Amino acid sequence: MNILFIMFDQLRFDYLSCQGHPHLHTPNIDNIAEKGVRFSRAYVQSPTCGSSRMSTYTGRYPSSHGVQFNAYPLRVGELTMGDHLRKAGMGCHLIGKTHMVADAEGMQRLGLAPDSMIGVRQSECGFDPFVRDDGLVAEGPAGRYDPKPSPYNEALKEKGYAGDNPWHDFANSGIDGDDVASGWFMVNSDKPANIK
């Protein structure tokens, strides 16, 4: 069995064509929505995305799990969806951003190395990182967590895009090299990606 859980950032519920938007066309998401389970009456627990994500991951309110803001650590030892699914024998991977940071103070107090398996899982809400939001394979503070190359970058290299990180250089940047578009601040978000 596979579970694909997609959590968007900065997306209104009615900005998908499967939700009836008259102009925005989202055929791939519509296809997934048609075949899967749609949470059409879901409500966030916090106006900040990081805190709301932690509520989804833990099943608890922000006042209980303690994450009140983005980039605020989830305490070491807090069980998440990833921890529970892993106990059931499932591989649990995270792709993208979470606004999550490790509980460095708690890990230091318990003698946990940030680049250990438990340290990396702690910094990724109990999941194993697969590919970061910038297209790179996840790295711990002391080096690579996963030795295999980034699948995004390898696919772009096969298409002729050069460099160590073609995802950053071509897909996640503006037309000129000095105008890098990042996250929801992208100045070029209304233009197609710089990929052939």
Where are the model-predicted features located?
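Formylglycine-dependent sulfatase
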Residues: M1-K196
